[in-house]
Design a protein with these regions (language model features):
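Catalytic cores of enzyme domains
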Residues: 67-213
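Non-catalytic, usually N-terminal nucleic-acid engagement modules in DNA/RNA processing proteins
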Residues: 1-74
């Protein structure tokens, strides 16, 4: 069984990498008894697109954000189909399916799955920080009952880096990630959306600031 788990892991990781995934990890999942593994995938955002952001989201970033989510959904679907052809069950969770915008919650937390799967650690900005790419990534998750080896969470943090705190237009980011102010953040997102800077509740300023350690 151990060899099967390792082989399955290697097959999925190769497929994901071939499809353009920049980071891949697996963790145990206990919230659904019939799907006990969670596969976390991440793709990189365009640095050139992010460089266009100054003090507000841009139309270009808004479209790029949607493109990234669409690509992740396609990749997650292809990985899920691969798993099903192998005789197992798979549930691709959309990259951006918000249940509550104000609390910034979804069907499940891609960020928590990514943390447990060793993709990165929770940053002060409430985003996952990848060791190389920082927070300039987007995430998706595939739940499955395929036997898979698992990864370990990274034992790292943001250290002395406070770039996201310095640039946050809402002052929502604090010294501790646990003190991140969701309400103030969302109020600023609503302002940006009302001003039609972007047709969705997004910002991108802290994403641009967090470009890896």
């Amino acid at each position: 069984m151990g060899m099967d788990k390792k082989l399955n892991y290697q097959k999925l990781k190769k497929l994901a990498t071939d499809l353009g995934v920049a980071a891949f990890g697996v963790c145990d999942f206990t919230e659904k008894k019939d799907l006990n593994s969670a596969v976390s995938i991440a793709i990189r955002l365009s640095k050139s697109v992010l460089d266009e952001i100054e003090d507000r989201p841009t139309k270009l970033y808004f479209h790029h954000y949607r493109q990234a989510n669409g690509l992740l959904d396609q990749i997650a679907m292809r990985i899920s189909n691969f798993i099903q052809f192998d005789g197992y069950n798979a549930l691709p969770v959309p990259a951006s399916q918000i249940v509550d915008w104000e609390k910034q919650t979804a069907y499940l937390s891609h960020k928590k799955i990514a943390e447990l799967a060793g993709i990165g650690w929770p940053g002060r900005s409430n985003l996952i920080v990848h060791p190389e790419f920082g927070s300039q990534i987007r995430l998706a998750t595939i739940l499955t009952d395929m036997p898979l080896s698992t990864d370990r969470p990274l034992k790292k943090d943001c250290g002395k880096c406070k770039r996201c705190i310095e640039v946050c237009p809402a002052a929502a980011i604090k010294e501790s990630q646990k003190d991140f102010d969701h309400i103030i953040c969302f109020e600023k997102l609503k302002f940006f959306q009302k001003q039609r800077y972007a047709d969705q509740y997004i910002c991108g300023i802290c994403v641009k600031a967090c470009n890896g350690k």
